[in-house]
Curated annotation (Swiss-Prot):
Reactions this protein catalyses: L-tyrosyl-[protein] + ATP = O-phospho-L-tyrosyl-[protein] + ADP + H(+)
Inhibition and activation profile: Present in an inactive conformation in the absence of bound ligand. Binding of VEGFA, VEGFB or PGF leads to dimerization and activation by autophosphorylation on tyrosine residues.
Protein name in UniProt: Vascular endothelial growth factor receptor 1
Principal location: membrane
Record's GO cellular component terms: endosome; extracellular space; nucleus; plasma membrane; receptor complex
Alphabetized Pfam families for the sequence: I-set (PF07679), ig (PF00047), Ig_3 (PF13927), Ig_VEGFR-1-like_5th (PF22971), PK_Tyr_Ser-Thr (PF07714), VEGFR-1-like_Ig-like (PF21339), VEGFR-2_TMD (PF17988), VEGFR1-3_N_Ig-like (PF22854)
Site description Cleavage, residues in chain: V768, A769
Length: 1333
């Protein structure tokens, strides 16, 4: 069947085929007719080209290569029936706004068929688009176009034109002109210049020139002759080629030549005489600048006779090249591996790469696996790359130290080898203070002060630290300042050296900072007197680092001080002083600041004195004589900082006061005084400048003498023990430059001298007795305070410098203030036992008058068991001292008192919390949990309506809630001891529903309590829900932050070696490195959050507490989000579980975040909002949805949270904060559940005795050669994990849940029916990784 296809018109292809079928019986097809006749047509640029093709069959168009089919100006209509009886096909081509580059041959041809193949089935016309500005179709002005030529063959220079009338000249650089002669060189406006037999003369740069309307146009071409140059010959695979007997040998010889080069390729090989090889050749022309020839030699089933030298020969004309390769044929495989260097290798941290290589000889090529410390290296880090038999470590760090093993295996030969090398990563010493110091200018040290200089160094091997002293250079020239430089002569310091300042001590200690052991060197300067530079130099075999501490001593506060002697008056002298530290400032001068047109101008002050230089400072005094009012203004001392180059100003305002004549505020008046008495005369005068006051008696000037005292400024006259001679006229005179004023009075003395002496004796005795009394009282008080202050000083030093003294010794030194905490045993009535610890017990008691309360108070008493040892007594006493040190806080179980005196047991009295620990309380509330207060309120109303028996005195059934911890109310409430009253209180709280607000509140309170404990340098080390106690008014308190606990019977404590540890709550650094810090408490707080929002669920349910759990935790696996946690809460958990302790939030930050959540949950108000978890819709029941954590969920920062919700109009919201983008989180496997009771889910964490077997590693063993061996690189399967049971799902809010109306702002009543959320399912456990660092 004849196939017919038209690229332009699909619908008419079938019709064309049918028509052709009719003509195929013997009719001849006429060639297609074009609407433009002739072989060529000339049109102007910008005109529209219209061509119509009429034919007897379906046809298509062929266009010049410069015309794009996608050009919007081109339009081709598909062939359609036309002519008589519609037996012809017509198609049109329209090209709008034709351009010069549209010049070319346009062809209309029939679609190929069996009928038209033998005949001319096309019509063509050459269209010239004439453009005076573009005479050539292609312009090559900057870069000539390459034209390949072969001598003796035709060469075409394709400088085609857009008009047949353009005259073109062909020139050869530099001055030759090639003129067409009609034979050897001809011109064709459609093709260009045609050279029949090209010679070497046409090699070079040719250009075509045309002049149109007086403008010269050029297009350039570069001819290139074919050569015989062989660029390269290679054989693949490279030499040597190794094969096993019976394999196939394939050698590919590749010859690279220049274009237009032809080659002859041949082989020489051992079996050439017998033609052992088959050879095939091919040419690769895909390269634009070269030709590539291939000759492939192949020998099947190689034998020993095929080994030897194989040579590929390449020849092109007179050029010849060859390439050799050697072939080796082996009977069987082999492996040999040795150390290329030493078994223990060293490198340096910071290197861009390090190659760990082995000397391996093997055939065939073995499988290679590198292990680091027993695990695949490439899986541990992307920085590990396997290259051949080498392992390349990129960007070497200290984490790369360890044992590296290369595993080599040839499965088909059953050959296996391994070899281990140890890598030590050395670190150049690093001084951490040097990296964090960013002050532009050095600090100043007060004269005579005691200073402590520290230098924290890290390096491998451990660096040696020395302190050096560089004295300052003293310059006695007045033109230069003193300066200090580290290039001066340096001296090594020791505590006994007398260089520079007196050294109190030089000490070193090891400490763990940010998880690494660092050396802290401390230099204590006892008395800062001499300026200079202290250098801390640390060195090891890798290198040396030095930190220079410029030690500039100053006797000027802050190094810059300006003072004004006094505010001057008109006519007085203005005296200003400027003092700067001479090591920090220079170019000191006084200037006057003036404001002109809102711009501050600096005016220099003439006739300034020279600055004087002292030992530590430079002083510049400014004195202006006889000032006037115009001298008022802002005076500034300007000095240039030597290090920053910045001009520093210190300003002082000067206001020159106008002169004012003196005047008296009150005149003197006559006065009578008894003999032996005393009197005071006041003469208060004002004036500018301040007047000078002079006293006269009977016109004689009074001078100060015994019995006559002149007060400040002579304004008062005090006469002691008046005698008869003191009677007379007293006159005071106030004088300044504006004038004088005076006042006088007569002093009359009454009485006799005998009476005066008696009074004098009596007064003297009284004063002496009073003085002795106050002196004795002062000495007594100071003696009482002395011991207390000394103990307090020692105590503070212990707390503030914990690394100087061991922790147990610190606790032993802590003071115990018996006057504050001691409580009489006879006022304490012991009651029932609350629990027993490792060496103590806790009992409930009633304390009468504790904390100065006039009533009885229920408390908890911690005391030792019978037969306690001295060490146990010391431990409980240490706990008591710690509690006194920590202090009082609302969210901490507080100390109330203690009984330590002889004659009875040691007892520690703390607060009593009657509602037990938070873990059991949350478990008891699983069937009473509601999402918000509205649902909780409706739930209570529903219960009241369905439980009439309670109103008739029927006692409700309570879930059993036990507590093993000491508790008390957080509020100082005095009440009588009454168990019935306590039971009634608990009955009330047991009936109250638990809401989401309560869970957030518990989390917030615990964060506040831990923030307080961390501020008191207290690390809890066992923060869990079992150690959180619930008190009245929904207040939670942290306990057991120092109390002994019975870890031997508690299933939450797992044995590791000889120690039981709460592994589920412990941070990785605590498990593996025994490092406890506030950041490890933050990790435990994250697990506590999981307990709270799972309503008392046990962490990692169903996961066996073994070494596998620890390794998976270290690899980044985490728990899945608990049932009732919102995305914000779960994000906080992940933040707390960050692998790097430094990236975990501080408790202060957790308080802030949870405080925002709590406030938003209460007020339903905030900035940015997302749905919490309770959604009220108009047309759906009250539902609860657990957020699905996926990649999509975290993609847009919870912009579109994945909650099951209906309408979003009536949604309750909680204030949100930004989330970090999370990678896909690794999870624990989900486990099949087993049956268990709700209150026994903690028993899933049963104590697991962890032995000491190593973690599973990759090991290969060798056996006899004939034995079956294989390499198995799979990790051993994980141990079976204990499952969780299906928890019973009790009915919430009773069996039916009605629809709830949306809560509107103006509604005050809830719907008649409501529903709480279902209980959590703790059977599915998913492990999450911490967010990326």
């Amino acid at each position: 069947m004849v196939s017919c296809w038209d690229t332009a018109v699909l619908p008419y292809a079938l019709l064309g085929c049918l028509l052709l079928t009719g003509y195929g019986s013997g009719s001849k097809l006429k060639v297609p007719e074009l609407s433009l006749k002739g072989t060529q047509h000339v049109m102007q640029a910008g005109q529209t080209l219209f061509l119509k093709c009429r034919g007897e069959a379906a046809h298509s168009w062929s266009l010049p290569t410069t015309v794009s089919q996608e050009d919007k100006r081109l339009s081709i209509t598909p062939p359609s029936a036309c002519g008589r009886d519609n037996r012809q096909f017509c198609s049109t081509l329209t090209l709008d706004t034709a351009q010069a580059n549209h010049t070319g041959l346009y062809t209309c041809r029939y679609l190929p068929t069996s009928t038209s193949k033998k005949k001319k089935a096309e019509s063509s016309i050459y269209i010239f688009v004439s453009d005076a500005g573009s005479p050539f179709i292609e312009m090559h002005t900057d870069i000539p176009k390459l034209v390949h030529m072969t001598e003796g063959r035709q060469l075409i220079i394709p400088c085609r034109v857009t008009s047949p009338n353009v005259t073109v000249t062909l020139k050869k650089f530099p001055f030759d002109t090639l003129t067409p002669d009609g034979q050897r060189i001809t011109w064709d406006s459609r093709r260009g210049f045609i050279i029949a037999n090209a010679t070497y003369k046409e090699i070079g740069l040719l250009n075509c020139e045309a002049t149109v309307n007086g403008h010269l146009y050029q297009t350039n071409y570069l001819t290139h002759r074919q050569t015989n140059t062989i660029l390269d010959v290679q054989i693949r695979p490279p030499s040597p080629v190794r094969l096993l007997h019976g394999q196939t040998l394939v050698l590919n010889c590749t010859a690279t030549t220049e274009l237009n080069t032809r080659v002859q390729m041949s082989w020489n090989y051992p079996g050439k005489a017998t033609k052992r090889a088959s050879i095939r050749q091919r040419i690769d022309r895909s390269h634009s600048h070269n030709n590539v020839f291939h000759s492939v030699l192949k020998i099947n089933n190689v034998e020993s006779r095929d080994k030897g030298l194989y040579t590929c020969r390449v020849k092109s004309g007179s050029s010849f090249q060859s390439f050799n390769t050697s072939v080796h044929v082996y009977e069987k495989g082999f492996i040999s591996v040795k150390h290329r260097k030493q078994p223990v290798q060293e490198t340096t941290a910071g290197r861009r790469s390090y190659r760990l290589s082995m000397k391996v000889k093997a055939f065939p090529s073995p499988e290679i696996v590198w292990l680091k410390d027993g695990s695949p290296a490439t899986l541990k880090s992307a920085r590990y790359l396997v290259h051949g038999y080498s392992l390349i470590i990129k960007d070497v760090t200290t984490e790369d130290a360890g044992d590296y093993t290369i595993l080599l295996g040839i499965k088909q030969s059953r050959l296996f080898k391994n070899l281990t090398a140890t890598l030590i990563v050395n670190v150049k010493p690093q001084i951490y203070e040097k990296s964090v110091s960013s002050l532009p200018s050095p600090p100043l040290y007060p004269l005579g002060s005691r200073q402590v200089l520290t230098c924290t160094v890290y390096g491998i091997p451990r660096p040696t630290i020395t302190w050096l002293w560089h004295p300052c250079h003293h310059n006695h020239s007045k033109e230069r300042y003193d300066f200090c430089t580290e290039n001066e002569e340096s001296f090594i310091l020791d505590p006994s050296s007398n260089l520079g300042n007196r050294i109190e001590s030089i000490s070193q200690r090891m400490t763990v900072i940010e998880g690494t052991n660092k050396t802290v060197s401390t230099l204590v300067v006892a008395d800062s007197q001499t300026p200079g530079i202290y250098s801390c130099r640390a060195f090891n075999k890798i290198g040396t680092v030095e930190r220079n501490i410029k030690f500039y001593v100053t006797d000027v506060p802050n190094g810059f001080h300006v003072s004004l002697e006094k505010m001057p008056a008109e006519g007085e002298d203005l005296k200003l002083s400027c003092v700067v530290n001479k090591f920090l400032y220079r170019d000191i001068t006084w200037i006057l600041l003036r404001t002109v047109n809102n711009r501050t101008m600096h005016h220099s002050i003439s006739k300034q004195k020279m600055a004087t230089t002292q030992d530590y400072s430079i002083t510049l005094n400014l004195v202006i004589k006889n000032v006037s009012l115009e001298d008022s203004g802002t005076y500034a001392c300007r000095a240039r900082n030597i290090y920053t180059g910045e001009d520093i100003l210190r300003k002082t305002e000067v206001l020159v006061r106008d002169s004012e004549a003196p005047h008296l505020l009150q005149n003197l008046s006559d006065y009578e005084v008894s003999i032996s008495g005393s009197t005071t005369l006041d003469c208060q005068a004002r004036g500018v400048p301040a007047p000078q006051i002079t006293w006269f008696k009977n016109n004689h000037k009074i001078q100060q003498e015994p019995g006559i005292i002149l007060g400040p400024g002579n304004s008062t006259l005090f006469i002691e023990r008046v005698t008869e001679e003191d009677e007379g006229v007293y006159r005071c005179r106030a004088t300044n430059q504006k004038g004088a004023v005076e006042s006088a009075a007569y002093l009359t003395v009454q009485g006799t001298s005998d009476k005066s002496n008696l009074e004098l004796i009596t007064l003297t005795c009284t004063c002496v007795a009073a003085t002795l009394f106050w002196l004795l009282l002062t000495l007594f008080i100071r003696k009482l305070k002395r011991s207390s202050s000394e103990v307090k000083t020692d105590y503070l030093s212990i707390i503030m410098d914990p690394d100087e003294v061991p922790l147990d010794e610190q606790c032993e030194r802590l003071p115990y203030d018996a006057s504050k905490w001691e409580f009489a045993r006879e006022r304490l009535k012991l009651g029932k036992s609350l629990g027993r610890g490792a060496f103590g017990k806790v009992v409930q008691a009633s304390a009468f008058g504790i904390k100065k309360s006039p009533t009885c108070r229920t408390v908890a008493v911690k005391m030792l068991k019978e037969g306690a040892t001295a060490s146990e007594y010391k431990a409980l006493m240490t706990e008591l001292k710690i509690l006194t040190h920590i202090g009082h806080h609302l969210n901490v179980v507080n100390l109330l008192g203690a009984c330590t005196k002889q004659g009875g047991p040691l007892m520690v009295i703390v607060e009593y919390c009657k509602y037990g620990n938070l873990s059991n309380y949350l478990k008891s509330k699983r069937d009473l949990f509601c999402l918000n207060k509205d649902a909780a309120l409706h739930m209570e109303l529903k219960k009241e309506s369905l439980e009439p028996g309670l109103e008739q005195g029927q006692k409700p059934r309570l879930d059993s809630v036990s507590s093993s911890s000491v508790t008390s109310s957080s509020f100082p409430e005095d009440r009588s001891v009454s168990d019935v009253e306590g039971d009634e209180d608990y009955s009330e709280i047991s009936k109250q529903p638990l809401t989401m607000e309560d869970l957030i509140s518990y989390s917030f309170q615990v964060a506040r309590g831990m923030e307080f404990l961390s501020s008191r340098k207290c690390i809890h080390r066992d923060l869990a829900a079992r150690n959180i106690l619930l008190s009245e008014n929904n207040v939670v308190k942290i306990c057991d932050f120092g109390l002994a606990r019975d870890i031997y019977k508690n299933p939450d404590y797992v044995r590791r070696g000889d120690t039981r540890l709460p592994l589920k709550w412990m941070a990785p650094e605590s498990i593996f490195d025994k490092v406890y810090s506030t950041k490890s408490d933050v990790w435990s707080y994250g697990v506590l959050l999981w307990e709270i929002f799972s309503l008392g669920g046990s962490p990692y349910p169903g996961v066996q507490m073994d070494e596998d759990f620890c390794s998976r935790l270290k690899e980044g696996m985490r728990m899945r989000t608990p049932e009732y946690a919102t995305p914000e809460i779960y994000q906080i958990m992940l933040d707390c579980w960050h692998k790097d302790p430094k990236e975990r939030p501080r408790f202060a930050e957790l308080v802030e975040k949870l405080g925002d959540l709590l406030q938003a949950n209460v007020q339903q108000d905030g900035k940015d909002y997302i749905p919490l978890n309770a959604i009220l819709t108009r047309n759906s029941s009250f539902t609860y949805s657990t957020p699905t954590f996926s990649e999509d969920l975290f993609k847009d920062g919870f912009a579109d949270p994945h909650f099951h919700s209906g309408s979003s109009d009536d949604v309750r919201y909680v204030n949100a904060f930004k989330f970090m983008s999370l990678e896909r989180i690794k999870t624990f496997e989900e486990l099949s559940p087993n049956s268990t009771s709700m209150f026994e889910d903690y028993q899933l964490d049963t104590s697991t005795l962890l032995g000491s077997p190593l973690l599973k590693r990759f090991t290969w063993t060798e056996t006899k050669p004939k034995a079956s061996m294989k390499i198995d690189l799979r990790i051993a399967s994980k141990s079976k994990e204990a499952g969780l049971s299906d928890l019973p799902r009790p009915s919430f809010c009773f069996s039916s849940c009605g629809h709830i109306r949306p809560v509107q702002d103006d509604e005050s009543e809830l719907g008649k029916e409501s529903c709480c959320s279902p209980p959590p399912d703790y059977n599915s456990v998913v492990l999450y990784s911490s967010p990326p660092a």
